[in-house]
Amino acid sequence: MSRLVLLLGVLLYVGAQLSQAQHWSHGWYPGGKRELDSFEVSEEMKLCETGECSYMRPQRRSFLRNIVLDALARELQKRK
């Protein structure tokens, strides 16, 4: 039983790390509102301009594999 609880805890932690939650450090305000004076283009929109939209990609078989590949792609994009 304790292994199940540990596994669920690890899965919850990994899921929270891989989710696309809003972060205070990125200049967002509570409630998902942006500052009205700045007109920033989001990173997702920049990717769409180059034809790399995540919603335009064909669906992959494994949901977990999809999450891991998207996380790796974001990390590589940050390093560029």
Curated annotation (Swiss-Prot):
Stimulates the secretion of gonadotropins. It is found in: Secreted. Expressed in the cell bodies of a cluster of neurons in the midbrain tegmentum. One of its GO terms (cellular component) is extracellular space. The modification Pyrrolidone carboxylic acid is found at residue 22. The lineage of its organism: Eukaryota, Metazoa, Chordata, Craniata, Vertebrata. It comes from the Eukaryota. Teleost species possess three paralogous GnRHs: mdGnRH and cGnRH-II have been identified in tetrapods; sGnRH has no tetrapod ortholog and is thought to be a duplication of cGnRH-II. The modification Glycine amide is found at residue 31. Residues 1-21 form the signal peptide. GO terms for biological process: brain development; camera-type eye development. This is Progonadoliberin-2. GO terms for molecular function: gonadotropin hormone-releasing hormone activity; gonadotropin-releasing hormone receptor binding. Belongs to the GnRH family. The gene is gnrh2. InterPro entries: GnRH, Gonadoliberin. Keywords: Amidation, Cleavage on pair of basic residues, Hormone, Pyrrolidone carboxylic acid, Secreted, Signal.
